[in-house]
Structure formats: structure tokens, C-alpha cells
Regions:
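Ligand-binding face of N-terminal immunoglobulin V-set domains in extracellular IgSF glycoproteins
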Residues: 112
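Short S/T/G/P-rich N-terminal loop/turn motif that feeds into the first structured element of a domain
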Residues: 1-94, 102-109, 126-246
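Conserved CoA-thioester-binding segment of acyl-CoA-metabolizing enzymes
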Residues: 115
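Short basic (Lys/Arg) and small-residue
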Residues: 118
Length: 246
């Protein structure tokens, strides 16, 4: 790991990782115009059907919550050339469903759940590209509060070396804690045998746009420290901001 502008490097303040398991279902259904998702009737139809499926999943004893998200914005990221060289499809997921289970072992029982199977079929029959992975939590600032009317981040990290992503993330997350008052963040690491297009996926939230977006657009150290360290360590960071499906 190489740290650029190391005088700015402060590690994030972390809690002990959670024992929860995570099932992430991400779908690219509509198109994008720059950083914004274009209106798409197929996306609207899918969103109308996802809510009842999430409710059915949430009623399981081994499921802590099942939450659906719709994309609203792609903030500045890093690594488009790296993705192109590696032949990796860029993350353009406009719908995400995140299922949190009581433990990692509980994820196996979800594979045959009828609501999960219906959800997968719905996304695969409608989406241009679907990414599904089961994951554990290697690190967290705090559990992400899905009950709040917040702006939710999923950042899809690609790198050949997962440990490098984790090491760099500790410092970039520290920057976000200090510069944007980041209240929560939970890393998801694909389990052995699961699709690992993304070495790690970071999930986080902020209470409002003004708490984080101005820093991404106007604070110089976002580019000279955060994006520069991703670039120096050959990490493709692909952040997308979502709103929770009500």
C-alpha cells in the first residue's frame, strides 16, 4: 500500500465488526445521463414490485431487515481506465436490495426462499446486468441506519488485492469522518465462492446532501488525498448514492 499525502492520513475510528450476514442484489435497469439516472419505465415497474418481496423476506426469523434502494446520483469516482484494462464492467446499478441476516450462516437458508427467488427472477428478467453476492462484514464505523430518511452510499471497489482496498479504505474513511461527519459505514466482503467482481463494497449514509456533496465537489483534499490514494493503489472506486424505497 502506498499512501499519497500521508500528512492527511488518519485512520477511521471503527467498531468491532458485526456478525451479520449480507445478501446484496444490484441491478442495472435504466440508463444514465452523466451522473444522473434517466427515467425508465422498467425501473418503475420493478420498484413497484420490490416492496412486497422485501416485506416477505423481512418476516423471516433469520432476517434482520430487507431494504430496497433506488439510485439518484453517481458522485466523482476513480478508476475507469483500470476497469477498462481489466475488462471489468463499470458499476451502474440503479436498484439495490440489501438483506441483512442475523449471522453469516443464515445466508445459506435464503437461497431457496420463494421471495428471494422471485426477486432474483424479477431483476434478471428486467435488468441489463445483475450482481448478486453474499458477504460478511470485515469492518464498520457503525451499522447503517435504514430507518432514517438519509442518502445512502454503495461504493463498489475493484482491485486485484483485497487487503490493499481494506488498508486504503481505513484512511479514506477517516477523511470522510473528519470532513463530512460520516456517521456510519459498513464494509461488505464477498464470501468464498461468491462473485467477487468487487473486492469490497462499502455501504454508508449521510443525513442530507449538504453534509457530504460540497466536500466531494469543492474540497481539494478529496481529489488530492481520497481519489489520489485510490489511483496510486490501483483501486477503482465506483460510488453511487441511493434513496431508500419507501
Amino acid at each position: 500500500m502506498d499512501i499519497v499525502n500521508d500528512h492527511l492520513a488518519v485512520k477511521a475510528r471503527l467498531l468491532t465488526p458485526t456478525d451479520n450476514g449480507f445478501l446484496l442484489l444490484a441491478a442495472e435497469i435504466g440508463g444514465w445521463a452523466g451522473p444522473f439516472p434517466l427515467p425508465a419505465r422498467p425501473r418503475s415497474r420493478v420498484l413497484a414490485q420490490i416492496g412486497p418481496l422485501c416485506s416477505r423476506l423481512a418476516r423471516r426469523d433469520d432476517v434482520a431487515e430487507a431494504t430496497a434502494f433506488s439510485a439518484v446520483l453517481r458522485p466523482p469516482g476513480e478508476g475507469s481506465r483500470l476497469l477498462h484494462r481489466a475488462g471489468v464492467r463499470p458499476a451502474r446499478y440503479d436498484i439495490v436490495v440489501l438483506i441483512r441476516t442475523g449471522g453469516v450462516a443464515d445466508l445459506e437458508a435464503l437461497r431457496t426462499d420463494p421471495a428471494r427467488l422471485e426477486l432474483v427472477a424479477l431483476l434478471e428478467n428486467t435488468g441489463r446486468h445483475v450482481h448478486i453476492t453474499a458477504a460478511s462484514n470485515p469492518a464498520r464505523i457503525a451499522d447503517v441506519d435504514h430507518n432514517a430518511d438519509s442518502w445512502f452510499l454503495f461504493n463498489y471497489f475493484y482491485c486485484r488485492d483485497r487487503q490493499t482496498v481494506f488498508d486504503v479504505w481505513q484512511y479514506t474513511a477517516g477523511w470522510f469522518q473528519r470532513k463530512t461527519a460520516l456517521p456510519d459505514s459498513a464494509l461488505m466482503q464477498p464470501l468464498t465462492g461468491e462473485p467477487d467482481d468487487y473486492s469490497l463494497i462499502n455501504h454508508a449514509s449521510w443525513p442530507s446532501l449538504r453534509t457530504f456533496l460540497p466536500s466531494l465537489l469543492f474540497r481539494p483534499t478529496f481529489r488530492s488525498f481520497v481519489l489520489a490514494n485510490f489511483s496510486a493503489n490501483e483501486i477503482a472506486a465506483q460510488p453511487i448514492i441511493y434513496r431508500r424505497l419507501r
